Structure formats: structure tokens, C-alpha cells
Design a protein with these regions (language model features):
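Short linear motifs in intrinsically disordered/low-complexity regions
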Residues: 4-6, 58, 100-101
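Hydrophobic transmembrane signal anchors and adjacent membrane-proximal interface regions, especially
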Residues: 13, 40, 51-53, 63, ...
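Residue-identity detector for glycine
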Residues: 16, 36, 57, 65, ...
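Amphipathic, interaction-prone secondary-structure segments
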Residues: 39-89
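Ampiphathic alpha-helical segments that act as solvent-exposed interaction surfaces
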Residues: 85-129
């Protein structure tokens, strides 16, 4: 083993792995197909300003001045759900890992696709009616 390999190995051991964060990241990746579907199905060219972002630790949909954002807070090992409208921000939910499942602390329920739909509907109520 070279000196560089030994140094990297020591740094890796020092940094360690956060198994809870790892599982949370894996669960967060389960949102990829949903945000990917939005990116794919929304028109490439539109009369309205919009963007759909699907990163490993941050996902959001923004239409004009309104945004729904889900991101991982790595310090707390939670998923934060926020609504942004103009310069205002409202925290909609904190999602934690409970028994290897995503759990909504505010709603007191297991996270489901229906709850994600509720977040989208609540955020874009002015558009959806």
C-alpha cells in the first residue's frame, strides 16, 4: 500500500460512515422517478417560467414565483419540506427515518405518494385551483 493509500485510508476511518444518513439518502432517492417524470413530461419550451431540479440531496419544482422544495438536512438527518412564495418560506414538514421508513412528524403519519401529492397541491393551489 502506497503512502497516499495509507493516508486516504486513515482519513476514511476518521470520517466514518453515518448509517442513518445513508439509509435516509437511499429513501430520498426513491423520489427520483417522480421528479424525473415531471422533468420529462413538462414541456421543454413553455409560456410559463418553471424548473424541476432532481439532485441527490435536494429536489424542487418551481413555477413562476412558487417553489416546493424537499432537501436533506444532514446535520439533523431529516428531510425538510418547504414552500417558497416570493421571499416568504413556510416549512410544511420534517420527515424522519423511523423503523427504516419515512415518517412525517407534523402529520404523524408514514410518508406516502399521496402526502407528496398533498404537498404539491398545497404549494401550487393558486395554479391547480
Amino acid at each position: 500500500m502506497s503512502n497516499l493509500d495509507q493516508t486516504i485510508s486513515k482519513l476514511k476511518a476518521y470520517v466514518g460512515e453515518d448509517s442513518e444518513e445513508k439509509v435516509l439518502m437511499e429513501k430520498f432517492k426513491e423520489f427520483d422517478p417522480i421528479f424525473g417524470k415531471m422533468r420529462k413530461e413538462f414541456p421543454e419550451f413553455s409560456q410559463k417560467e418553471y424548473v424541476v431540479i432532481n439532485l441527490d440531496d435536494d429536489k424542487y419544482i418551481k413555477i413562476e414565483g412558487t417553489q416546493l422544495r424537499l432537501f436533506i438536512n444532514k446535520q439533523k438527518n431529516i428531510i425538510v419540506v418547504e414552500k417558497h412564495h416570493g421571499s416568504d418560506m413556510t416549512k410544511l414538514e420534517e420527515i424522519v427515518l423511523q423503523d427504516n421508513e419515512l415518517y412525517c412528524t407534523g402529520r404523524g403519519a408514514k410518508f406516502t405518494e399521496d402526502i407528496l401529492n398533498d404537498f404539491i397541491s398545497e404549494t401550487f393551489i393558486e395554479i391547480l385551483g
